[in-house]
Amino acid sequence: MAQAFVNSKIQPGKVVVFIKPTCPYCRKTQELLSQLPFKQGLLEFVDITAAGNISEIQDYLQQLTGARTVPRVFIGQECIGGCTDLVNMHERGELLTRLKQMGALQ
Protein backbone atom coordinates (compact mmCIF):
# COMPACT_ATOMS: atom_id res chain seq x y z
CA MET A 1 0.00 0.00 0.00
CA ALA A 2 2.79 2.47 0.87
CA GLN A 3 4.57 1.67 -2.40
CA ALA A 4 1.41 2.24 -4.47
CA PHE A 5 0.69 5.48 -2.57
CA VAL A 6 4.18 6.91 -3.14
CA ASN A 7 4.37 5.76 -6.77
CA SER A 8 0.96 7.29 -7.53
CA LYS A 9 2.25 10.70 -6.44
CA ILE A 10 5.57 10.71 -8.33
CA GLN A 11 4.92 11.82 -11.91
CA PRO A 12 6.95 13.14 -14.84
CA GLY A 13 6.70 16.92 -15.21
CA LYS A 14 5.66 17.48 -11.60
CA VAL A 15 7.44 18.38 -8.36
CA VAL A 16 6.32 16.31 -5.39
CA VAL A 17 7.58 16.72 -1.84
CA PHE A 18 6.84 14.19 0.90
CA ILE A 19 6.57 16.06 4.21
CA LYS A 20 5.54 16.01 7.85
CA PRO A 21 3.86 19.30 8.82
CA THR A 22 5.77 19.64 12.11
CA CYS A 23 9.21 19.23 10.50
CA PRO A 24 11.17 22.53 10.25
CA TYR A 25 13.08 21.33 7.16
CA CYS A 26 9.78 20.49 5.48
CA ARG A 27 8.47 23.98 6.23
CA LYS A 28 11.64 25.56 4.80
CA THR A 29 11.28 23.44 1.66
CA GLN A 30 7.62 24.45 1.33
CA GLU A 31 8.51 28.14 1.74
CA LEU A 32 11.22 28.00 -0.93
CA LEU A 33 9.12 26.13 -3.50
CA SER A 34 5.95 28.12 -2.78
CA GLN A 35 7.76 31.33 -3.81
CA LEU A 36 8.30 29.99 -7.33
CA PRO A 37 5.72 30.54 -10.10
CA PHE A 38 4.62 26.94 -10.64
CA LYS A 39 1.89 26.16 -13.14
CA GLN A 40 -1.25 24.98 -11.39
CA GLY A 41 -1.12 21.33 -10.37
CA LEU A 42 2.63 20.88 -10.93
CA LEU A 43 3.72 21.29 -7.29
CA GLU A 44 2.36 18.98 -4.62
CA PHE A 45 3.19 18.61 -0.95
CA VAL A 46 2.20 15.18 0.36
CA ASP A 47 1.67 15.02 4.13
CA ILE A 48 2.69 11.46 5.00
CA THR A 49 1.18 11.78 8.49
CA ALA A 50 -2.29 11.97 6.91
CA ALA A 51 -1.83 8.61 5.17
CA GLY A 52 -1.78 6.67 8.45
CA ASN A 53 1.10 4.34 7.57
CA ILE A 54 3.99 6.76 8.10
CA SER A 55 6.60 4.15 8.92
CA GLU A 56 5.77 2.04 5.84
CA ILE A 57 5.95 5.12 3.61
CA GLN A 58 9.31 6.11 5.08
CA ASP A 59 10.59 2.54 4.65
CA TYR A 60 9.61 2.65 0.98
CA LEU A 61 11.20 6.10 0.54
CA GLN A 62 14.39 4.58 2.02
CA GLN A 63 14.24 1.74 -0.49
CA LEU A 64 13.53 4.16 -3.36
CA THR A 65 15.92 7.01 -2.51
CA GLY A 66 18.42 5.76 0.06
CA ALA A 67 16.98 7.94 2.85
CA ARG A 68 13.81 7.72 4.92
CA THR A 69 13.92 11.29 6.25
CA VAL A 70 11.57 14.02 5.11
CA PRO A 71 11.32 16.12 3.14
CA ARG A 72 11.98 13.93 0.10
CA VAL A 73 11.90 16.13 -3.00
CA PHE A 74 11.09 14.61 -6.39
CA ILE A 75 11.56 16.61 -9.57
CA GLY A 76 9.74 14.52 -12.09
CA GLN A 77 10.56 10.94 -11.20
CA GLU A 78 14.01 11.73 -9.76
CA CYS A 79 14.59 12.30 -6.07
CA ILE A 80 17.01 15.20 -5.66
CA GLY A 81 17.25 14.69 -1.88
CA GLY A 82 16.01 16.78 1.02
CA CYS A 83 15.91 20.40 2.14
CA THR A 84 19.67 21.04 2.09
CA ASP A 85 19.98 19.51 -1.39
CA LEU A 86 17.11 21.68 -2.65
CA VAL A 87 18.56 24.88 -1.13
CA ASN A 88 22.01 24.12 -2.61
CA MET A 89 20.47 23.42 -6.01
CA HIS A 90 18.55 26.72 -5.82
CA GLU A 91 21.65 28.70 -4.79
CA ARG A 92 23.59 27.27 -7.75
CA GLY A 93 20.78 28.32 -10.11
CA GLU A 94 20.13 24.71 -11.09
CA LEU A 95 16.64 24.50 -9.61
CA LEU A 96 15.08 27.22 -11.77
CA THR A 97 16.87 25.90 -14.86
CA ARG A 98 15.58 22.40 -14.26
CA LEU A 99 12.03 23.55 -13.55
CA LYS A 100 11.99 25.73 -16.69
CA GLN A 101 13.32 22.85 -18.81
CA MET A 102 10.52 20.58 -17.65
CA GLY A 103 7.89 23.27 -18.23
CA ALA A 104 6.74 23.46 -14.60
CA LEU A 105 6.95 27.25 -14.26
CA GLN A 106 4.61 29.93 -15.61
From Swiss-Prot:
Signal peptide: none annotated. One of its GO terms (molecular function) is glutathione disulfide oxidoreductase activity. The modification N6-succinyllysine is found at K9. The keyword Protease does not apply. Keywords: Acetylation, Cytoplasm, Disulfide bond, Electron transport, Redox-active center, Transport. Has a glutathione-disulfide oxidoreductase activity in the presence of NADPH and glutathione reductase. Reduces low molecular weight disulfides and proteins. NCBIfam families: GRX_euk. This is Glutaredoxin-1. It comes from Bos taurus (Bovine).
